[in-house]
């Protein structure tokens, strides 16, 4: 039996990609004439309709949510094969295949359908919420990523204890462990907000519509994924006023700024953990009576604690802590604080390591403050079927 089904072809699946909750979706399977191969169809570019015929076999759609039982839906025979139209009213991640006689039409190479005796691999279908929208300004735009320390420097770099200034702009940053086996990443080349602002005209010439900035919050390292203070910009980058000026000037060029939100972990050298006592606060490492103690999980206090992938300079945050949720997601929290500067949204670091409940609350907070803000989650694997680890 020779059939054709490709979920990326609108002739086979009326809506490619994800489907909005309640929208009508049509599947078509084409029954090709005997001895006519899919390869010939593509090489000859033969009109598909002329190479199909009405099948004798019956076909059934097997469809169900991830981890749940599949439901069966009979397909209707047509002059070209089989068809079915349906609406899915519940959001979620679904998987499906087709049953034709004693064979399963499942996902083959290149995501084409293939007939076999095995039920898997199944095709995937994401059904998203009816009211979900992508802001118009973000559609079809060009997103330009900037690593702030190395993009552009204007003016002198401030002298800050514990940070090594670099004056060889094109040099290789220090990345090897020190004598204690620590990778400090504490050499800085001095890229800053004013430097980015000086390049806005250039970025506009590239048709850039949004800039994604790697972390800008105060931190001990040059990559700044070890947040020290969520409410302050890193002093090497400039001041809050410098950042506000950058946001305002970027908008004049039709460019919006997207900030990197690192909410799965903080730095050990931070207001909140304060492992080295460099901040005036009482950090979680210093006392169980710290207002931040509930933010972290200790196995043996204070030196054994959960950290991001076992890297002890990045103590992992307990997102279930009501205190932490209020600090990040609350009315006077971090998210709304930076949205008030006019940013275009957030890119979430290791989004798949944030609990679903936290992500939902985060989205509500951001969209309540600015419905036009975007939220982008970092996922290293296939993001289309990603479910949070915790």
What residue spans do the PLM features occupy?
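Hydrophobic faces of well-ordered beta-strands that scaffold small-molecule active sites
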Residues: 142-144, 211-213, 257-259, 346, ...
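Conserved, well-ordered alpha-helix/loop/beta-strand core segments that scaffold catalytic motifs
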Residues: 338, 344-347, 351-353
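Substrate-binding/active-site clefts of carbohydrate-active enzymes
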Residues: 147-209, 216-341, 362-369, 385-386
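Catalytic metal-binding/acid-base residues of hydrolase active sites
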Residues: 262-264, 349-351, 380
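Short, surface-exposed acidic/glycine-rich loop or hinge patches that mediate macromolecular interfaces
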Residues: 216, 322, 352-353, 380
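Non-catalytic scaffold segments within catalytic domains of secreted glycoside hydrolases
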Residues: 380-390
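Glycan-association/targeting regions that enable binding to alpha-glucans and other polysaccharides
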Residues: 1-141
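Acidic-and-aromatic substrate-binding clefts and catalytic sites of carbohydrate-active enzymes
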Residues: 235-237, 351-357, 382-384
């Amino acid at each position: 039996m020779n059939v054709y089904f490709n979920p990326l072809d609108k002739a086979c699946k009326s809506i490619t990609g994800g489907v909005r909750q309640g929208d009508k979706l049509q599947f078509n399977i084409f029954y090709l004439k005997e001895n006519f191969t899919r390869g010939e169809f593509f090489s000859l570019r033969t009109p598909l309709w002329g190479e199909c015929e009405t099948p004798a076999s019956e076909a059934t759609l097997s469809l169900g949510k991830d981890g749940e039982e599949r439901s069966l839906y009979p397909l209707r025979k047509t002059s070209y094969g089989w068809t079915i139209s349906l609406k899915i009213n519940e959001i979620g991640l679904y998987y499906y295949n087709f049953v034709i006689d004693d064979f399963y039409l499942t996902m083959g190479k290149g995501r084409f359908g293939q007939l076999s005796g095995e039920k898997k691999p199944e095709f995937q279908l994401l059904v998203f919420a009816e009211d979900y929208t992508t802001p118009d300004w973000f559609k079809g735009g060009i997103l330009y990523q900037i690593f702030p320390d190395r993009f552009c420097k204007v003016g002198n770099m401030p002298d800050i204890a514990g940070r090594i200034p670099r004056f060889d702009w094109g040099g290789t940053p220090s990345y090897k462990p020190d004598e204690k086996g620590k990778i400090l990443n504490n050499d800085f080349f001095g890229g800053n907000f004013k430097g980015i602002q000086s390049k806005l005209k250039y970025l506009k010439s590239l048709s850039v519509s949004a800039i994604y900035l790697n972390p800008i919050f105060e931190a001990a390292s040059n990559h700044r994924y070890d947040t020290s203070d969520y409410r302050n910009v890193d002093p090497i980058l400039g001041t809050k006023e410098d950042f506000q000026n950058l946001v305002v000037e970027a908008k004049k060029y039709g460019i919006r700024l997207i900030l990197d939100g690192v909410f799965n972990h903080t730095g050990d050298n931070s207001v909140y953990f304060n492992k080295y006592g460099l901040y005036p606060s009482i950090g979680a490492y210093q006392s169980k009576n710290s207002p931040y103690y509930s933010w972290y999980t200790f196995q043996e206090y204070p030196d054994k604690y959960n950290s991001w992938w076992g890297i002890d300079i990045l103590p992992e945050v307990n997102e279930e802590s009501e205190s932490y949720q209020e600090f990040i997601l609350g009315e006077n929290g971090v998210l709304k604080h930076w949205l008030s500067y006019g940013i275009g949204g957030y890119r979430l670091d290791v989004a798949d390591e944030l609990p679903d409940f936290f992500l939902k609350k985060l989205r509500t907070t951001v969209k309540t403050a600015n419905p036009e803000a975007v939220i982008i989650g970092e996922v290293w694997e296939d993001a289309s079927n990603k479910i949070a680890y915790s």
